[in-house]
């Protein structure tokens, strides 16, 4: 069991609704296996302002947080030691300190803190 699980939803080139379903299933699987963090690779899109997956999935993550499915989520560009939520995540899941996207401002990922 690893505390951190990575899921590349972008790889299959799904439409947004399919990507939402895939990520929800992956959240359930990550929780079942005891992961504390799910790193979702959704890409940023080529428009320069965030593609459908990036924007749509992040809205979905906000809803999952409100529903209590996840504790919180961090957009990749905010995944920094200067973010108080990230500091709390690092304290709870110290393995995250070695993640290559920490402090990298990667807009193509989101970090989900699982309950």
Segments the model singles out, each with a brief description of its role:
Residues 1-115:
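Long, charged, low-complexity intrinsically disordered regions
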């Amino acid at each position: 069991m690893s505390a951190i699980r990575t899921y590349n939803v972008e790889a299959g080139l799904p439409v947004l609704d399919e990507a939402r379903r895939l990520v929800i299933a992956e959240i359930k699987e990550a929780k079942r296996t005891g992961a504390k963090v799910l790193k979702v690779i959704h890409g940023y899109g080529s428009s320069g302002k965030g593609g459908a997956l990036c924007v749509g999935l992040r809205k979905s993550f906000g809803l999952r947080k409100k529903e209590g499915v996840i504790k919180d989520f961090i957009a990749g560009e905010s995944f920094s030691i200067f973010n108080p939520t990230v500091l709390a995540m690092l304290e709870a899941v110290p393995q995250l300190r070695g993640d290559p996207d920490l402090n990298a401002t990667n807009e193509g990922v989101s970090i989900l803190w699982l309950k």
